[in-house]
A protein has these predicted regions:
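A conserved ligand/cofactor-binding region detector
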Residues: 1-195
Length: 195
């Protein structure tokens, strides 16, 4: 209730200030930031990218009455958003690319210099945070690199990803001696007629 709630908030704020002080002391001693940051994690809001093909069990676990209240609140917000969402069903050869969108542009035979009738679709990818015009389209390879780099840097980046930055991040992730492949797990394409 009111007084107890305020008391709980005060205790939480005191714990936060104490954690920050302890983290600052460890930092002054030269302890790695990855270690010192662990102390302040319970008090931080983070950004993350989650990709999945089936959410039913996750929602069953996290919307359950005994679930951690914070994750339950997040799960409820996610469930609400996903219930309102209209998924984009991908076809063979198309890709799930966070931070990159796509255009399906009808291609007609006249585009190729002949008679006008529809022959299919060309898919052009673009950076969702910038200009969506056809002049600024990405190739599939560029879109994959852009998406992977954006996923890799989601926790700290501003909205200033460029293809040059994406290429550098891509090279650090996949062309280094030790491969850091987890950001690539968000890139997906349908497996058709596999089962």
């Amino acid at each position: 209730t009111g007084e107890d709630l305020q008391c709980a908030k005060d205790v939480w704020e005191s714990a936060l200030k104490n954690a920050v002080g302890q983290a600052n002391q460890l930092d002054a001693l030269g302890v790695a930031k990855e270690v010192t940051n662990r102390i302040t994690e319970p008090y931080q809001l983070i950004k993350a990218v989650w990709s999945a093909t089936d959410w039913e069990n996750w929602f069953n676990l996290r919307l359950e009455k005994d679930a951690d209240p914070n994750i339950c609140m997040l799960a409820f917000k996610m469930y609400e958003a996903m219930s309102k969402s209209v998924p984009l069903l991908l076809k063979k050869g198309e890709y799930h690319l966070p931070y990159a969108g796509k255009y399906d542009i009808p291609v007609t035979y006249s585009d190729l210099g002949g008679y006008e009738y529809e022959t299919g679709y060309n898919v052009f990818y673009y950076d969702k945070e910038r200009d969506h015009t056809i002049e600024h389209c990405l190739t599939l390879e560029e879109a994959i690199k852009y998406s992977v780099a954006s996923c890799a840097s989601v926790s700290y980046r501003a909205t200033d990803m460029t293809l040059d930055k994406a290429e550098k991040i891509w090279n650090m992730l996949v062309k280094s001696e030790v491969v850091h492949a987890s950001p690539l797990t968000h890139i997906a394409t349908p497996i058709v007629n596999h089962w």
